[in-house]
């Protein structure tokens, strides 16, 4: 367990959000209420094909941000145009579940996203049709765990929030209640 106390966002979900969602969609069963399954944070490092030391920086940044050691993503097949060989490391990803997932989501929503310059909100169109939401961040500096003086280069990342929602409307409602700042369409 990452912490001894229940994460703030998890408590809010159990006490407030679950009830609101049950009323909003009039679910018969408690198990129908959408919830979070996992959060996958992916950092693609295409330049690592030319310089293998770049992957170490991505691993260090992801470990610092998520508190978990990332898995290295390797190329599945060789592509000559990209100077890529099969099995070469080209990225890193972390799958967060349980309390670590709730803590990471809380830090992302309350600390990291407000630190983005000219932030107007997340696009409400990036749902996949099954209630899961993916968004990208252009740099890792917005997380306060990263020391700005120690970064070797800016790296973006993709964050996928996997939910138990069956469609986009349920997923959007869940994430809005959790505090995702969606742009008004």
From Swiss-Prot:
Disulfide partners: none
PROSITE patterns named among the record's database cross-references: RIBOSOMAL_L5 (PS00358)
A Gene Ontology term for the protein's cellular component: cytosolic large ribosomal subunit
A single GO molecular function term of this UniProt record: rRNA binding
Single GO BP term: translation
Gene3D superfamilies documented for this protein: 3.30.1440.10
Keyword tRNA-binding: yes
UniProt KW tRNA-binding keyword: yes
Pfam families xrefs: Ribosomal_L5, Ribosomal_L5_C
Keywords of the record: Ribonucleoprotein, Ribosomal protein, RNA-binding, rRNA-binding, tRNA-binding
SUPFAM superfamilies: RL5-like (SSF55282)
Function of the protein: This is one of the proteins that bind and probably mediate the attachment of the 5S RNA into the large ribosomal subunit, where it forms part of the central protuberance. In the 70S ribosome it contacts protein S13 of the 30S subunit (bridge B1b), connecting the 2 subunits; this bridge is implicated in subunit movement. Contacts the P site tRNA; the 5S rRNA and some of its associated proteins might help stabilize positioning of ribosome-bound tRNAs.
Subunit field text: Part of the 50S ribosomal subunit; part of the 5S rRNA/L5/L18/L25 subcomplex. Contacts the 5S rRNA and the P site tRNA. Forms a bridge to the 30S subunit in the 70S ribosome.
Family: Belongs to the universal ribosomal protein uL5 family.
Descriptive protein name: Large ribosomal subunit protein uL5
Protein source organism: Streptomyces coelicolor (strain ATCC BAA-471 / A3(2) / M145)
């Amino acid at each position: 367990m990452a912490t001894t106390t229940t994460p703030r966002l998890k408590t809010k979900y159990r006490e407030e959000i679950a009830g609101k969602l049950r009323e909003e969609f009039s679910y018969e069963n408690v198990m129908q209420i959408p919830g979070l399954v996992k959060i996958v944070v992916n950092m693609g490092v295409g330049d690592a094909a030319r310089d293998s030391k770049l992957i170490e920086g991505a691993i260090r940044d992801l470990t610092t941000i998520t508190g978990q050691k990332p898995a290295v993503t390797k190329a599945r097949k060789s592509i000559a145009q990209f100077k890529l060989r099969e099995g070469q490391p080209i990225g890193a990803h972390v799958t967060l579940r349980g309390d670590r997932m709730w803590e990471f989501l809380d830090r992302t929503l309350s600390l990291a996203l407000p630190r983005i310059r000219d932030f107007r909100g997340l696009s409400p169109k990036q749902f996949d049709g099954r209630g899961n939401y993916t968004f990208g961040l252009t740099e890792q500096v917005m997380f306060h765990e990263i020391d700005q003086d120690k970064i070797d280069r800016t790296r973006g990342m993709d964050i996928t929030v996997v939910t138990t929602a069956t469609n986009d409307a349920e997923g959007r409602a869940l994430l809005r209640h959790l505090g995702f700042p969606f742009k008004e369409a």
